[in-house]
């Protein structure tokens, strides 16, 4: 395999075990960062042409330190003092409340693991884009506008996304075109160009699946979306830097590898509510009145999400891979995804599989680092685990991979 892609270094058992331990800790830290309300997504490398954050989320604050002013801190301190006083006056009630919170959270986590595991791909996502058709035509030399238009004809949401994109003046300036009020998807595809369509369609196809409007998880949605974009684009960039044929396949690989997160977060609110109702019924049947009435005060507990993501994302991604119909020409892409799901050592992977591993490592590093929570001393081990050359890290960051490079 190309040395531009991997370091080809062999490490002793002690170093390998340490790198694996650090990898598990960092992945866990990233899952907690995703759901934490304390950390917001750094906006400096977000591609607003594809993110829906401005539509559904609160006003964007570019720096985390701007979130809390000194006056707000004083107010929070006063409010905390009052809460503490009330807690002393109602200590027993708080104890019951705490136990109910833990009880519901435990039940909700078990319920989510069970129900999500049993769902079909259509149940998980509500709809599943026609990646089978896309992958069968997108990377062929015979790809043309007519073949691409089949997708916009059969997928109304994709059609609307394509039209919105080519009618966006800022986006059009990136591809050297003038914005027009286009209504014909075929003309819109022509405006984008075949190369840009093969690059962007997987992103536009998956875009409607993530629920940005859920008030419980709307703080998580921008982070999930950026993780998908980074994973997809960095996979493409690494394949490009290694001189692999059809590097744009990296976009689809990244999308398919990360979209399972969308399903988990999309279902969280409803599944938590279902679990809460089930516990209320149990308390009522057991005549536990205090616990029963305490249920009404419980809000969805996001702290269980990291465990659910950790337990299910590989299993659900296998369902995604199985849902796509692969051809003899695209089976290497399927194999790359399976290499990642099976945790095949990077040195034993195909170039696509190695690039996908490195892209995920970069995506996690980048977002944690921008929030100041990546452990710096872990960096050499983190990237050594995916055989990523040190110089590649800066090369990728210099390209601002949160934004998609387009052909003009």
PLM regions and their residue ranges:
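Flexible internal linker/loop segments at domain or repeat junctions
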Residues: 276-305
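Conserved alpha-helical "signature site"
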Residues: 2-255, 262-270, 301-408
């Amino acid at each position: 395999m190309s040395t531009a892609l991997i370091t080809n270094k062999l490490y002793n058992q002690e170093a390998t075990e340490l790198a694996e331990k650090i990898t598990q800790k960092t992945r866990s830290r990233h899952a907690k960062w995703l759901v934490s309300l304390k950390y917001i997504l750094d906006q400096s490398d977000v591609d607003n042409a594809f993110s829906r954050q401005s539509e559904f989320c609160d006003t964007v604050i570019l720096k985390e330190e701007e979130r809390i002013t000194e006056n707000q801190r004083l107010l929070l301190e006063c409010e905390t003092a009052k809460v503490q006083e009330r807690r002393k006056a109602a200590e027993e009630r708080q104890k019951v409340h705490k136990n109910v919170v833990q009880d519901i959270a435990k039940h909700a986590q078990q319920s989510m693991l069970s129900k999500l595991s049993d769902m079909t791909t259509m149940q998980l996502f509500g709809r599943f884009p026609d990646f089978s058709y896309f992958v069968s035509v997108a990377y062929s030399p015979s790809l043309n506008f007519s073949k691409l238009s089949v997708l916009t004809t059969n997928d109304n949401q994709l059609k609307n996304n394509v039209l919105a994109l080519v009618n966006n003046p800022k986006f059009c300036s990136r591809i050297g075109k003038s914005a027009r009020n286009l209504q014909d998807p075929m003309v819109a595809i022509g405006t984008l160009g075949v190369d840009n369509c093969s690059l962007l369609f997987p992103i536009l196809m998956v875009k409607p699946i993530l629920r940005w409007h859920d008030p419980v998880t709307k703080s998580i949605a921008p982070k999930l979306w950026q993780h998908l974009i980074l994973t997809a684009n960095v996979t493409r960039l690494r394949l490009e830097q290694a001189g692999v044929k059809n590097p744009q396949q990296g976009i689809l690989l990244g999308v398919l590898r990360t979209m399972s997160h969308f399903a988990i977060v999309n279902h969280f609110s409803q599944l938590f509510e279902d679990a809460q109702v089930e516990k209320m019924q149990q308390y009522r049947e057991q005549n536990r009145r205090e616990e029963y009435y305490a249920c009404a005060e419980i809000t969805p507990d996001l702290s269980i999400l990291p465990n659910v993501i950790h337990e299910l994302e590989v299993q659900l991604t296998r369902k995604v891979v199985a849902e796509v119909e692969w051809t003899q020409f695209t089976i290497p892409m399927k194999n790359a995804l399976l290499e990642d799901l099976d945790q095949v050592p990077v040195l034993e992977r195909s170039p696509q599989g190695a690039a996908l591993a490195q892209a995920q490592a970069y995506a996690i590093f980048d977002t944690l680092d921008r929030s100041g929570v990546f452990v710096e001393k872990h960096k050499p081990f983190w990237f050594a685990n995916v055989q990523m050359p040190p110089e590649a890290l800066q090369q990728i960051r210099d390209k601002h991979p949160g934004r998609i490079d387009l052909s003009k």
